[in-house]
């Protein structure tokens, strides 16, 4: 924590998640954004992309302007701008950035992300799943974080939606096995028109014109943050032509018999208790755009789910895959700092 009493953070990669993490940070009193790094866009372009957002609207909290090529002004607040390609070259230490949000989508394993430490950062939070960095989902397993960990992953937006819901169901009723489908909005890696995609040919098709089946490791990743569910969940994804907000369909076989009403009551109770602000509950007749800007990880849609019988049920939960996830990145940093 800096001399201001705020946690000083830097952001590497000013894409969708990087910019929204910045927006979340700039609205909080306990976080100070001190630097951003992106070698692929100018400071002027970076400013425009931050200020105007097709999904989340114009930034109105304070004026954003370019002071010079290496400095942004958010109101009176100076934020350093770097353009380094390699993480080890970014001078985080010079600006006092203790925590770095690694949101390029490139440096997602421990060794690559650890390069930020050479520039003076103390901790790195990867805003993506990682094959070898410990993964934390706030509301599920963040209590397992130990202060000697320097590189961690905030998992994926879908895992952040699925894990709190799966935890409640497993804690209350037990999960024998389950399948997840996420109906997921467009992301930056998709194509605007049909084009080549070496590993995933379907993924190369036009994002705004197709429903695209895709793979996801989000359900299996729940087994990493909740080991009791390891091997019990898997899933797939449909990419659909919406700009933001996604929805998880979790179909599970229960150990203990429970009516759908009992399941709803359990989720509602947790959403108002230990998981308040993480897991939501609604009985309204909602659609996807109703959740744009919702900071919760997972909002259970009580009317959308259905039970076949007392041991086999389909549960539906919404999430703003951009804003909700970015909010958890900051929450994880705050938790890490509190255990330092």
UniProtKB/Swiss-Prot annotation:
Cytoplasm keyword on record: yes
Classification via SMART domains: Gp_dh_N (SM00846)
Keyword flag Transcription: no
EC number from the UniProt entry: 1.2.1.12
Annotated Pfam families: Gp_dh_C, Gp_dh_N
Record GO terms (molecular function): glyceraldehyde-3-phosphate dehydrogenase (NAD+) (phosphorylating) activity; NAD binding; NADP binding
Reactions this protein catalyses: D-glyceraldehyde 3-phosphate + phosphate + NAD(+) = (2R)-3-phospho-glyceroyl phosphate + NADH + H(+)
Gene3D superfamilies according to UniProt: Dihydrodipicolinate Reductase, domain 2, NAD(P)-binding Rossmann-like Domain
GO biological process, one term: glucose metabolic process
Top enzyme class: oxidoreductase
Keywords recorded for this protein, A-Z: Cytoplasm, Glycolysis, NAD, Oxidoreductase
Pathway membership: Carbohydrate degradation; glycolysis; pyruvate from D-glyceraldehyde 3-phosphate: step 1/5
GO CC field: cytosol
Ranges in a coiled coil: none
Annotated positions binding D-glyceraldehyde 3-phosphate: 156-158, 187, 216-217, 239
Catalytic residue positions: 157 (nucleophile)
Subcellular location: Cytoplasm
Binding residues annotated for NAD(+), in chain numbering: 16-17, 38, 85, 321
Record site: Activates thiol group during catalysis: 184
Subunit structure: Homotetramer.
Membership in a protein family: Belongs to the glyceraldehyde-3-phosphate dehydrogenase family.
PANTHER family with a match to the protein in the record: GLYCERALDEHYDE 3-PHOSPHATE DEHYDROGENASE, GLYCERALDEHYDE-3-PHOSPHATE DEHYDROGENASE GAPC1, CYTOSOLIC-RELATED
Extra facts: Plants contain two types of GAPDH: cytosolic forms which participate in glycolysis and chloroplast forms which participate in photosynthesis. All the forms are encoded by distinct genes.
Role according to the record: Key enzyme in glycolysis that catalyzes the first step of the pathway by converting D-glyceraldehyde 3-phosphate (G3P) into 3-phospho-D-glyceroyl phosphate. Essential for the maintenance of cellular ATP levels and carbohydrate metabolism.
Protein name per Swiss-Prot or TrEMBL: Glyceraldehyde-3-phosphate dehydrogenase, cytosolic
């Amino acid at each position: 924590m800096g001399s201001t009493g705020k946690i000083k953070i830097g952001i590497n990669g000013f894409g969708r998640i990087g910019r929204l993490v910045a927006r979340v940070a700039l609205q909080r009193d306990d976080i100070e954004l001190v630097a951003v790094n992106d070698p692929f866009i100018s400071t002027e372009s970076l400013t425009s992309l931050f200020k105007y957002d097709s999904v989340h609207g114009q930034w109105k909290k304070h004026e954003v302007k370019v002071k010079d090529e290496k400095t942004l002004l958010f109101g009176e607040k100076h934020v350093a701008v770097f353009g380094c390609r390699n993480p080890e070259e970014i001078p985080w230490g010079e600006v006092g950035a203790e925590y770095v949000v690694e949101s390029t989508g490139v440096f997602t394993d421990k060794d690559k992300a650890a390069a930020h430490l050479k520039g003076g950062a103390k901790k790195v939070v990867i805003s993506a799943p990682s094959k070898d960095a410990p993964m934390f989902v706030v509301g599920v397993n963040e209590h397992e974080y130990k202060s000697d960990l320097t590189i961690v992953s905030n998992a994926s937006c879908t895992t952040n939606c699925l894990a709190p819901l799966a935890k409640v169901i497993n804690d209350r009723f037990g999960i024998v096995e389950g399948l997840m489908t996420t109906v997921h909005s467009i992301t930056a890696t998709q194509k605007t028109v049909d084009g080549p995609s070496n590993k995933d040919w379907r993924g190369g098709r036009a994002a705004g014109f197709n429903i695209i089946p895709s793979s996801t490791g989000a359900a299996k990743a729940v087994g990493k943050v909740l080991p009791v569910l390891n091997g019990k969940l898997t899933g797939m994804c449909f990419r659909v032509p919406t700009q933001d907000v996604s929805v998880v369909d979790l179909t599970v076989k229960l150990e203990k018999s429970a009516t759908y009403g009992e399941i709803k009551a359990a989720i509602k109770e947790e959403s108002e208790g230990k998981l308040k602000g993480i897991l939501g509950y609604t009985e309204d007749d909602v659609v996807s755009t109703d959740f744009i800007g919702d900071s919760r990880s997972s909002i259970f849609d009580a009317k959308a789910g259905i039970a076949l019988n007392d041991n086999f049920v389909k549960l539906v939960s919404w999430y703003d895959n951009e804003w909700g996830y970015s909010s958890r990145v900051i929450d994880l940093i705050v938790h890490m700092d509190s255990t330092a």
